[in-house]
Amino acid sequence: HFLTGSIIEPIENLADNLDASDSVKVYKELVPFVQTIKKQHEDIMRNATMRQEFTANVSHELKTPLTSISGYSELIESGMAADEDIVRFAAEIHKNSNRLLTLINDIIRLSELDQVEEHNCFEELDIYDIAQNCVEMLRLSAKKHDVTMELHGVHRIICANRQMMDELVYNLCDNAIRYNNPGGRVDITVDAAVAFDKTAETGATIIEVKDTGIGISKEHQERIFERFYRVDKSRSKSTGGTGLGLAIVKHIVAAHKNASLSLTSEPGKGTCIRVAFKMKTNLE
């Protein structure tokens, strides 16, 4: 009993004091076990915190347009809105309804990407063609924001999921338009990686989205791909951004083992985001 107790006691002490595990004395044979348990505990706590923050952010983001819709519709229903205001109120309801729908779609998509299976419908596709289609889809939005969009480069074949690539390029370009300045530019370039960097892997492909927008300071650059994180909240509100576009981009890149994501930016000068694809015919 004494021997059993002497073995179990440090483990029980550890279980009761996970947050102060460094101060708990254990046999040297148990040190790797303690380190593993501590890391797992930290991962669980971090994920729990992220879930709580995400839930709080979702609640806030959903509440804002719903409050606006409820307020304007109540004024119309009660007859308190003047005839000349009804059309304007209806336009606000329509705008906030669209914002709400976009937000819900993005939340659902993020949830789907969290559960994406490896090797899910990956195929060889032309990323230049996808970028070209995206530019055509967003021309009206770019014109509305007084932003010029141009596509450069050459046709390049990569191995990827087609739907995800459509979403990746769309979200990168949409973000570059929304956070640009009137009279600004968005340049999308698809080319071999060596065209950007002579030391890059031969055969690799890069898609680059570069804008002349507000830019991102150093302290914000690591967090810009987090869900609902916004550098300029007032700009997001005025442009209708959900704060989830770049989070979706990060998830899509993570789902492709042959892809990597990088960002360079300077406040007042703009942002450049690159997604690089290694030369692979499969994701093994």
Q: Residues of each region from the PLM?
A:
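Short conserved segments within the C-terminal catalytic ATPase subdomain
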Residues: S141-L151
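Membrane-proximal HAMP signal-relay module
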Residues: H1-T55, S70-E77, A82, E112, ...
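A conserved beta-strand-to-alpha-helix junction within the catalytic ATP-binding
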Residues: C121-R139, A192
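Glycine-rich ATP-binding loops of the HATPase_c
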Residues: K257-T264
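Short helix N-cap motif at coil->helix boundaries in the Bergerat
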Residues: I127, G215-E226
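Conserved micro-motifs of the catalytic ATP-binding
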Residues: Q115-N120, G153, I157-N161
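Short alpha-helical segment of the dimerization/phosphotransfer core of two-component systems
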Residues: K95-L100
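Short helix-loop "hinge" at the ATP-lid/N-box region of the Bergerat-fold HATPase_c
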Residues: A176-I177
